Amino acid sequence: MAWTSLILSLLALCSGASSQAVVTQESALTTSPGGTVILTCRSSTGAVTTSNYANWVQEKPDHLFTGLIGGTSNRAPGVPVRFSGSLIGDKAALTITGAQTEDDAMYFCALWYSTHF
């Protein structure tokens, strides 16, 4: 069996009424099939909380987008259990436990910010 590395590229998105927040993630992470990787998402406005409703989206090389996690930790229907969302410290996190070669993709984090009038 040939072992290959998975390169997980990350981009960050920000949605909501506040245009001043900056969301940052690692630029790339690598693991081997069967490995565990934790991708994190940080906000410039402070700690990420459940009120930010962190969402994680996967983009495959053929530009197919799949919503993985919504509302910080809710796995979308049909998403394998190896994907999980959580908060770690002041960041949102996507954990891939037992990574598979088909997980080689871009991963996007989106946070919700609302402004009260």
UniProtKB/Swiss-Prot annotation:
Residues 20-117 form the Ig-like domain. It comes from Mus musculus. Transmembrane segments: none annotated. Keywords: Adaptive immunity, Immunity, Immunoglobulin, Pyrrolidone carboxylic acid, Signal. The modification Pyrrolidone carboxylic acid is found at Q20. One of its GO terms (cellular component) is immunoglobulin complex. It comes from the Eukaryota. Gene3D superfamilies: Immunoglobulins. The keyword Ribonucleoprotein does not apply. Residues 1-19 form the signal peptide. GO terms for biological process: adaptive immune response; immune response. This is Immunoglobulin lambda variable 2. InterPro entries: Ig-like_dom, Ig-like_dom_sf, Ig-like_fold, Ig_V-set, IgV_Light_Chain.
